[in-house]
């Protein structure tokens, strides 16, 4: 499946194959040709400006913009051959960068194979059509004699240079003109050629202010985008279009009714899906369902059409080949009549993988590229990246974040303060912004209208106007209320065959990568076809964003923008002072508004002679004290941190509370922080109704079940709609407040530093030179203190935003939903009574009980189920895991305790032992009454509700069950962890983890005795089994409205539907004990036992699992720490049926087949352990370290224990090697005068989840001789063998799934005995 990226120079001659003269689709038949380059299969690069549908004047910079962020214009860009050559080479480099990462390669592979359907909604049913603009373009071929012929080619994607705006990349599907209307096959399932306008050299910049990270520093929050990620963003749009899934039917429309609201293009659902992250939640669930259903119906129509195709306008097209391609593309099945049909299970996987699998956010993580946290993150002017072809600036594996230049951590390579060599600011007439003018009258008016951006205005004594210009980016995006669907409030009719809606749309990029690695390569068909010789192609008209004037607003009072402007310092170094009067600062360019009284007093007094350094220190101390202010308010208990100076900093006031921000906040709540208060009332939610009844009992019960499921859907739909409104109308305002406060603190710091610099300039004390470094250190400290203040501000805004969501919007929604429940329950009860004669009295009582139970508890809104919108996803998972932990057993100083914060009490009985665990110590339980640990749960973590979700996780080590024990005790089920509550009627209720032979069992039982179980049956091959003496990580999630899921080592192993269970009245105690175990010699070890108050999702489980697997300590075969001076047997992971043997002392080692054991009756087999050579690891240089653990990166010597002696392993200088590369290792070699290279490094270079180790060998100059592995070869007259060698070859193959340099170190252990 490797993808080849072709390399070109623009001057390369046309070859009618990979370099052609293209007549693009919008020029087809007009004899207008462009030089085009086939960068890879079915993708072409045309190094020309995208001019289709434009006018020449569109390329010239306008005076202003109608809407949107800043734009950069240059009509001369990409007009010369040298420009085109640089563009072409840059695109080749970006494609190589994308291809070099498996996630990017998978994206390219899907695009290459997503061939547009040869036809569309308007083409003939029974015929493929290759002449349509949507699938082909013409080209002009020239033979050696100079004669030309016109041909045509089928393709998927054509990439041009940028259109009029250099920093505006766009993807357009081919538009067909049908019946005087525009028709888009890319939106109808068929797909079409996709055209991209792209510029790699001018990239957007953005802020990371709302990320709550400690590395954030004032002045260092701006980043520039990586053009590879910009290209992948557009390629995701291409993928959607090729599959006919490009979304056009829904947009988030910006409100523009107030002057502080951004003038922005409507944001399409297509754009939000492509960006990903939390912003995709702006698209409500009912809209997502509608889009899903539309594509499903489109594909059904295509399946029907494909079934009828029998011919093509081009007789050379292989119809059967294309049918197979489309069957695979659309994942169609065939019915018994050979007709293509949509398999809805396959369709759901396909749809989710295309629409939700690839996103900018997820690809950024895979490529280690910094990108915006939110689609609404603060954007700034674009910058130029002039040296993308310079590998020291940008390479095709790391991009800008080059580790060797110390630019990898914290994305320093993209940081505008750190990597200044990588970019150039753009300015001049080419840079155009959407500006808003705010003008305020000052004393008696004059005709003066001055732009005070540069602080050069001087007003006359007669007065005038103060006018400031504000960039559109500085305004707040707030969505119109009609951007959100009201479908969840509409009436719905339920019947026995009602189809439930999917409530979650997502797909893991990791799953796509796994599927890509497993799939076989598709054979692409011939891309040549017949040309169109005449035509009048249609190109849609370019919509210009140019404006000729700046929008001006007259205001009477100061706004936040006057407050921020009054805090800006002059650009030149001069004497300035600080003032607490905004108006004073606005009319006097040497005065800076500040809201820190002590700072104002200190800086204005100036340096006092030789006390200069102390004056600076005092300023820093005052700034620290005032900027770190925070408080709490009892009435707003869910906001833990309130920053009181935000009010005077941003002009946040309430009438009657001027100068008292805290008082105003206490009176009004967090709504005070909003400029625009959205409407939180919801339309009435129509009660569910039931279709005409059936007399069949099964259908009646199914109708009732569907009704209850639909009721659950309704709650979730309304919650998600409310969350979408919050994201689009409220959360953007709180995020903007954070940006505004960041800017304010930045201005405060800048003013203080300039005052210090000016005072230092005029300072003439004798210590002036000596204190220079200290002054700089103190100024840096000033930035650090502002950064800490910013963290408090982010917490304040984040929690205030959540508070408004939960206490205002969700509470209002719950009122409506409870009314909906009341009406719907009455309808359902009436339905049951009306049909009681068909279902019987007994069933009637059960159903009534079930309905009362369901409707008695509202479905909770859990914020933890929604991504935090203020921190990045990786940090968010850590936060979720920490906040949702309600029990966490830890062992410290040999005492077992709960460290979750809920302080459950723990009783440890005498025979509950402590042994080495996965990290630290673990609980070891043997089979007697006093080997027991009891956790008495805190009251806060009771689970006496049928809607409480939870997760149990722990590490488990169980000895291998021998064949004799399996025969004797194989039917004995015994619990190891239990929360079962015993009632007087002997009906247990709760949950338990138990073992039975080779099976692990999870049991849930409700108080009525209903039971659900998941049984994991271990592998018959005990060497690879989970429950055979290795440490394994067990996670069981329980979603009470869905299923219980059992994971082992992060992999789903079993599920059980649990929606039918009632309340689980579990015991107050959790008991860790071997209960009802018949084998007196049985034991288990348990480590890191935790309970979470939510059903963890797969990504959270993966993060939890890997968090325990530190690569600091290497591990033996069982998962215990690898130790020095301990005997181990070595097993190669890639050849696990082999052992290591030695030919002779001083000679080589090789692999032999290990003995095996098979028991057909019990279905057990495995390779026996403890055979072959024994190895011992010793420190390369003895030291006084107390612990005996081998750490990754330790330098070691490896010995073989042979005939009661220890013999060192190494490679003699100039020794034998296969191909002069694979150096043959020797044991006990000791030839006079020939040094033995024996220095090794124990490392973990790959596969964190496997308990394997790699060994790296060095020569006497510390040069690598390679990793220890095997080579199949022959030495002398010996037979062909797998011989142990050291080879550098392995370093180039570390990404391979199986590699011969991975080794298991197997110590003898009581938990494994060979049968």
UniProtKB/Swiss-Prot annotation:
EC class name: hydrolase
Q: Which cofactor does it need?
A: Zn(2+)
Reactions catalysed according to its record: Hydrolysis of 76-Gln-|-Phe-77 bond in synaptobrevin 2
Q: How is the cofactor bound?
A: Binds 1 zinc ion per subunit.
Record GO cellular component, one term:
cytosol
Residues annotated for Zn(2+) binding in this entry: 233, 237
Q: State the Gene Ontology BP annotations.
A: proteolysis; symbiont-mediated perturbation of host neurotransmitter secretion; symbiont-mediated suppression of host exocytosis
Name the Pfam families for this protein. Answer: Peptidase_M27, Toxin_R_bind_C, Toxin_R_bind_N, Toxin_trans
UniProt cross-references to PROSITE patterns, sorted A to Z: ZINC_PROTEASE (PS00142)
Keywords from UniProt, A to Z, are:
Disulfide bond, Hydrolase, Metal-binding, Metalloprotease, Neurotoxin, Plasmid, Protease, Toxin, Virulence, Zinc
Question: Superkingdom of the source?
Answer: Bacteria
Cystine pairings recorded for this chain? 439-467, 1077-1093
Q: What is its EC number?
A: 3.4.24.68
- Active site located where? 234
Q: Fetch the Gene3D superfamilies from UniProt.
A: 2.60.120.200, 2.80.10.50, Clostridium botulinum neurotoxin b, 'coiled-coil' domain, Metalloproteases ('zincins'), catalytic domain like
Keyword Secreted carried by entry: no
One GO MF term, please?
A: zinc ion binding
InterPro entries recorded for this chain?
A: Bot/tetX_LC, Clostridium_toxin_transloc, ConA-like_dom_sf, Kunitz_inhibitor_STI-like_sf, Toxin_rcpt-bd_C, Toxin_rcpt-bd_N, Toxin_trans
Family, per entry: Belongs to the peptidase M27 family.
Quaternary assembly: The precursor polypeptide is subsequently cleaved to yield subchains L and H. These remain linked by a disulfide bridge and are non-toxic after separation.
Q: What does this protein do?
A: Tetanus toxin acts by inhibiting neurotransmitter release. It binds to peripheral neuronal synapses, is internalized and moves by retrograde transport up the axon into the spinal cord where it can move between postsynaptic and presynaptic neurons. It inhibits neurotransmitter release by acting as a zinc endopeptidase that catalyzes the hydrolysis of the '76-Gln-|-Phe-77' bond of synaptobrevin-2.
Quote additional remarks. Answer: The C-terminus of the heavy chain binds to ganglioside receptors.
This protein's name? Tetanus toxin
* Protein's organism: Clostridium tetani (strain Massachusetts / E88)
């Amino acid at each position: 499946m490797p993808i080849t990226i072709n390399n070109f120079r623009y001057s390369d001659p046309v070859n009618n194959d990979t370099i052609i003269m293209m007549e693009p689709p919008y020029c087809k038949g007009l004899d207008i040709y462009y030089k085009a380059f086939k960068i890879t299969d079915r993708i072409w690069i045309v190094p020309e400006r995208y001019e289709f549908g434009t006018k020449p004047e569109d390329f010239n910079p306008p005076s202003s913009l109608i809407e949107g962020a800043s734009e950069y214009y240059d009509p001369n860009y990409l007009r010369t051959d040298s420009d085109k050559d640089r563009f072409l080479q840059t695109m080749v480099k970006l494609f190589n960068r994308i291809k070099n990462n498996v996630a990017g390669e998978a994206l390219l592979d899907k695009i290459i194979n997503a061939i547009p359907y040869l036809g569309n909604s308007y083409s003939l049913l029974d015929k493929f059509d290759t002449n349509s603009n949507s699938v082909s373009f013409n080209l002009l071929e020239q033979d050696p004699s100079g004669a030309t012929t016109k041909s045509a080619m089928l393709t998927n994607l054509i990439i041009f240079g940028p259109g009029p705006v250099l920093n505006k990349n766009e993807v357009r599907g081919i538009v067909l003109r049908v019946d005087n209307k525009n028709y888009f096959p890319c939106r109808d399932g068929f797909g079409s050629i996709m055209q991209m306008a792209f510029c790699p050299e001018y990239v957007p910049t953005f802020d990371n202010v709302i990320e709550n990270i400690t590395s954030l520093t004032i002045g260092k929050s701006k980043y520039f985008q990586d053009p590879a990620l910009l290209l992948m963003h557009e390629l995701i749009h291409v993928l959607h279009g090729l599959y006919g899934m490009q979304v056009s039917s829904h947009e988030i429309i910006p409100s523009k009714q107030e002057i502080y609201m951004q003038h922005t293009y409507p944001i399409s659902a297509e754009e939000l899906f492509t960006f990903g992250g939390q912003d995709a939640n702006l698209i409500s669930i009912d809209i997502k369902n509608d889009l899903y259903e539309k594509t499903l119906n489109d594909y059904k129509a295509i399946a029907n059409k494909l079934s009828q195709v029998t011919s093509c306008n081009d007789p050379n097209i292989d119809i059967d080949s294309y049918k197979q391609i489309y069957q695979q593309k659309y994942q169609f099945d065939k019915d018994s009549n050979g007709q293509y049909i949509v398999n809805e299970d396959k369709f759901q996987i396909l749809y989710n993988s295309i629409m939700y699998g690839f996103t900018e956010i997820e690809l950024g993580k895979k490529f280690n590229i910094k990108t915006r946290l939110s689609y609404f993150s603060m954007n700034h002017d674009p910058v130029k990246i002039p040296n993308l072809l310079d590998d020291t600036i940008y390479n095709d594996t790391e991009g800008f974040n080059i580790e060797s230049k110390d630019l990898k951590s914290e994305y320093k390579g993209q940081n505008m303060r750190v990597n200044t060599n990588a970019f150039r600011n753009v300015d001049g007439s080419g840079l155009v912004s959407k500006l808003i003018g705010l003008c305020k009258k000052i004393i008696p008016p004059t005709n003066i209208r001055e732009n005070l951006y540069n602080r050069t205005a001087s007003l006359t004594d007669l007065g005038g106007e103060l006018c400031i210009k504000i960039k559109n980016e500085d305004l707040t995006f707030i969505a119109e209320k009609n951007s959100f669907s009201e479908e969840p409030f509409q009436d719905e009719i339920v019947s026995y065959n009602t189809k439930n809606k999917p409530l979650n749309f997502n797909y893991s990029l990791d799953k796509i990568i796994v599927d890509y690695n497993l799939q076989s390569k598709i054979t692409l068909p011939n891309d040549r076809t017949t040309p169109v010789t005449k035509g009048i192609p249609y190109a849609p008209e370019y919509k210009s964003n140019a404006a000729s004037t700046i929008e001006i607003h007259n205001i009477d009072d100061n706004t936040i923008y006057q407050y921020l402007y009054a805090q800006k310092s002059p650009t030149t170094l001069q004497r300035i002072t600080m003032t607490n009067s905004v108006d004073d600062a606005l009319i006097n360019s040497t005065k800076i508004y500040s809201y820190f009284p002590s700072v104002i007093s200190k800086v204005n007094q100036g340096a006092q002679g030789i006390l200069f350094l102390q004056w600076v220190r005092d300023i820093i101390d005052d700034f620290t004290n005032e900027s770190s202010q925070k408080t709490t308010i009892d009435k707003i208990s869910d906001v833990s941190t309130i920053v009181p100076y935000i009010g005077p900093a941003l002009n946040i006031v309430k009438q009657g509370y001027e100068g008292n921000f805290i008082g105003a906040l206490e009176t009004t709540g967090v709504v005070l922080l909003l400029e625009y208060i959205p409407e939180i009332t919801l339309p009435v939610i129509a009660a569910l109704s039931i279709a005409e009844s059936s007399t069949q009992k099964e259908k009646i019960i199914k109708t009732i079940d569907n009704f209850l499921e639909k009721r659950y859907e309704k709650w979730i739909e309304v919650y998600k709609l409310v969350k979408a409104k919050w994201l689009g109308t409220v959360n953007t305002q709180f995020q903007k407040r954070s940006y505004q406060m960041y800017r304010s603190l930045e201005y405060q710091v800048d003013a203080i530093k300039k005052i210090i610099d000016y005072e230092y300039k005029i300072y003439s004390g004798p210590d002036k030179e000596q204190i220079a470094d200290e002054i700089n250190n103190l100024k840096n400290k000033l930035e650090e203190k502002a950064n800490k203040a910013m963290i408090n501000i982010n917490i304040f805004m984040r929690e205030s935003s959540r508070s408004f969501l939960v206490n205002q919007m969700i509470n209002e929604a719950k009122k409506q939903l409870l009314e909906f429940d009341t009406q719907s329950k009455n309808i359902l009860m009436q339905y049951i009574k009306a049909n009681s004669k068909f279902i019987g009295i007994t069933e009637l009582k059960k159903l009534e009980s079930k309905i009362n139970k369901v409707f008695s508890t509202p479905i909770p809104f859990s914020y933890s189920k929604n991504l935090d919108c203020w921190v990045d996803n990786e940090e968010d998972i850590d936060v979720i895991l920490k906040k949702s932990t309600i029990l966490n057993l830890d062992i410290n100083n040999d005492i077992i305790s709960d460290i979750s914060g809920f302080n459950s009490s723990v009783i440890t009985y005498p025979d509950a032992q402590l042994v080495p665990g996965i990290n630290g110590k673990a609980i070891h339980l043997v089979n007697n009454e006093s080997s027991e640990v009891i956790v008495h749960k805190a009251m806060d973590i009771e689970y006496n509700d049928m809607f409480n979700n939870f997760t149990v996780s722990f590490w488990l080590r169980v000895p291998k069950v021998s064949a004799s024990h399996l025969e004797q005790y194989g039917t004995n089920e015994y619990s190891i962890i239990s929360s079962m509550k015993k009632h007087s009627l002997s009906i247990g209720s709760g949950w338990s983890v138990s073992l039975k032979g080779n099976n692990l069992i999870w049991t849930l039982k409700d108080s009525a005795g209903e039971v659900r179980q998941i049984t994991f049956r271990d592998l018959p091959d005990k060497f690879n089994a989970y429950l055979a003496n290795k440490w394994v990580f067990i996670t069981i999630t329980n979603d009470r409205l869905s299923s219980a899921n059992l994971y082992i080592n992060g992999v789903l192993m079993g599920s059980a539907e649990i929606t039918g269970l009632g309340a689980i009245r579990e015991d107050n105690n959790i008991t860790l004990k071997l209960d009802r175990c018949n084998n007196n010699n049985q034991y288990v070890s348990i480590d890191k036992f935790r309970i979470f108050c939510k059903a963890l999702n797969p990504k959270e489980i993966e993060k939890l699992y890997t968090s325990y697997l530190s690569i600091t300590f290497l591990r033996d075969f069982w998962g215990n720490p690898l130790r020095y001076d301990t005997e181990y047997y070595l097993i190669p992971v890639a050849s696990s049926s082999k052992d290591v043997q030695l030919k002779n002392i001083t000679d080589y080692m090789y692999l032999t087949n290990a003995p095996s054991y098979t028991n057909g009756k019990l279905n057990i087999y495995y390779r026996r352990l403890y055979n072959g050579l024994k190895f011992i690891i010793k420190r390369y240089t003895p030291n006084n370290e107390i612990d005996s653990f081998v750490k990754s990166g330790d330098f070691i010597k490896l010995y073989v224990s042979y005939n009661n002696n220890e013999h060192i392993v190494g490679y003699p200088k100039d020794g034998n090697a296969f191909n002069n590369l694979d150096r043959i290792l020797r044991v006990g070699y000791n030839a006079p005068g020939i040094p033995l290279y024996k220095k090794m490094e124990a490392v973990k270079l790959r596969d964190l989840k496997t308990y394997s180790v790699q060994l790296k060998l060095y020569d006497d100059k510390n040069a690598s001789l390679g990793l220890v592995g095997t080579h199949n070869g022959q030495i002398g007259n010996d037979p062909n063998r797998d011989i142990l060698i050291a080879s550098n070859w392995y370093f180039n193959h570390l990404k391979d799934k199986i590699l011969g340099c991975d080794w298991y170190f197997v110590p003898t252990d009581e938990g494994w005995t060979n049968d």
